[in-house]
Regions:
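Predominantly five- to eight-bladed beta-propeller fold
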Residues: 69-71, 110-135, 146-199, 384-394
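Conserved beta-propeller blade repeats
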Residues: 38-54, 79-92, 117-143, 171-178, ...
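Beta-propeller domains
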Residues: 55-78
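Serine-hydrolase catalytic core recognition
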Residues: 156, 219, 353-445
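Structural motif
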Residues: 59-64, 95-99, 153-159, 183-185, ...
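Short loop/turn segments that connect beta-strands within beta-propeller blades
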Residues: 66-69, 102-105, 190-194, 241-243, ...
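A short helix->beta-strand "capping" segment at the edge of beta-propeller domains
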Residues: 21-39, 194-201, 404
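Hydrophobic h-region of N-terminal signal peptides that target proteins for export
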Residues: 10-19
Length: 445
């Protein structure tokens, strides 16, 4: 969002006086709606097995071998009348209740609440703390965990809907500071016994947050990062998915300012008795830590003074993003969980988004930078080989404006670099003084 605002601002600061004949000024409609200045992209995706990937244009779906770069097959994109609606997901929420699809393809209700303010199977806590869904299916699909949200005592807040011709008020329940919040519980439905159990969560007060729900690989336990409403204390608890009972607290994190859990735990594929835990409380930055299922800390996986984010794992390798190269870049690294040897995978400056092929041999790397609209490369798993498969043209090439500058300014104490982007008027004269608009993002992230 911030990048979009800065880009639009730069394009609006153009003047007709210095417009080069072969370039043009952006229109107000293009600036506001983003039409005509969008970066071209392609939706490359790995196939379910091996190291082949697909992408499509308006007429054709291509399947390509990552090793050779050769096209394996081409099929026509189905016509609109041939495109059928896909099947219902295995478990889903509809009108505030949870359903699953049985072996015969029929929808079966798990919950049947109709009280105002009771919602099941949907995201809770305003999508904070890494919460992005409300249904969690066990690895073997036998059990379905789901949030139940009771917001019946939460204050109704009016919002103006400007999409209607005259404008209408729509009410939503919003837990204001210091006022009653929603009450969250977690149910577990067994598709074999057709019974639901509720996890016995008793930490803190009932206005606690249940965050980052994680199944163990066997599908009989659930791990929850339970956070108090003051957001200063978090317990990583494990519960029985069979009867809902509390088993134990593995460990707790606390901070006098606030705690903000963001990620689930990640069980080791080659050792289900160990998992990766991410936190920024212990060493000042988001880092990864290896624990066993008794809660004991085995090692700090990423001992760097920078924020990192877990991506995936393959054998003994943990792949993760890191800001250690530059706080305005995101690079992919991997570390050997046994030896501790770490390798930087991506080399080009920019913001990288990567995915590992199912066979673990290749990486699909999408990245953009200050002067790179959108590049897509195929990398070897160790990053030593790189093949470019797509480079987007510059969407501003025909537009008349001065390129945005980047740089750093030292903090007042001289210890830290503050990064900036500088947007100058098209007729900028370095001998003159100009008023400056300084925009600072004041949020917590």
């Amino acid at each position: 969002m911030k990048r979009d605002i800065l880009t639009i601002t730069a394009l609006l600061i153009m003047t007709v006086a210095n417009a080069q004949e072969e370039r043009r000024l952006i229109t107000m409609e293009e600036a506001v709606l983003g039409t005509g200045i969008r970066t071209e992209s392609r939706n490359y995706r790995w196939q379910e097995e091996g190291s082949t990937y697909t992408y499509s244009d308006e007429s054709t779906i291509y399947v390509i071998d990552a090793k050779s770069g050769k096209t394996i097959s081409e099929t026509a994109v189905p016509k609109e009348e041939e495109q059928k609606e896909g099947p219902k997901p295995y478990a889903y929420s509809e009108k505030g209740n949870v359903y699953y699809t049985d072996q015969d393809g029929n929808a079966q209700a798990i919950t049947s609440y109709n009280e105002p303010g009771i919602v099941c199977g949907e995201t809770v806590s305003r999508n904070e703390f890494g919460i992005s869904g409300g249904i969690f299916v066990s690895p073997d699909k036998r059990r379905i965990a789901f949030y139940k949200k009771d917001e019946s005592k939460v204050t109704l807040f009016p919002l103006l809907d400007i999409t209607s011709r005259t404008g209408t008020l729509q009410e939503t329940r919003y837990p204001m500071n210091g006022m009653t919040s929603e009450i969250i519980t977690l149910g577990v439905f067994d598709t074999e016994t057709k019974e639901t159990v509720w996890l016995d969560v008793t930490d803190f007060t009932e206005e606690r947050y249940l965050t980052n729900i994680t199944w163990n690989p066997a599908g009989d336990k659930i791990y929850i990062q339970v956070l108090d409403r003051n957001q200063k204390n978090m317990n990583l608890n494990v519960y029985s998915a069979i009867d809902g009972s509390f088993i134990k607290t593995l460990f707790s994190d606390s901070d006098s300012r606030y705690i903000e859990p963001q990620y689930p735990i990640y069980f080791m594929e080659n050792n289900p008795e160990q998992f990766i835990y991410a936190t920024n409380v212990r060493d000042g930055y988001w880092n990864l830590y290896l624990h066993n299922t008794d809660g004991k800390l085995i090692k700090r996986v990423t001992p760097v003074d920078a924020d990192v984010e877990y991506l995936t794992q393959n054998g003994n390798y943990i792949y993760y993003y890191s800001a250690e190269v530059s706080p305005i870049d995101r690079h992919l690294f991997r570390t050997n969980i046994k030896s501790g040897k770490t390798e930087r995978i991506t080399k080009e400056s920019g913001w990288h988004t990567c995915s590992l092929s199912p066979d673990g041999k290749y990486i699909l790397d999408r990245y953009s930078a200050h002067n790179v609209p959108n590049n897509i490369n195929i990398l070897s798993a160790d990053g030593k080989k790189s093949t470019n498969i797509f480079s987007a043209p510059d969407p501003t090439a025909e537009l008349n404006f001065i390129p945005i500058e980047q740089g750093t300014i030292k903090s007042a104490d001289g210890k830290y670099d503050n990064y900036y982007r500088l947007i100058k008027p098209l007729d900028f004269d370095p001998s003159k003084k100009y008023p400056v608009i300084l925009y600072v993002y004041g949020g917590p992230h």
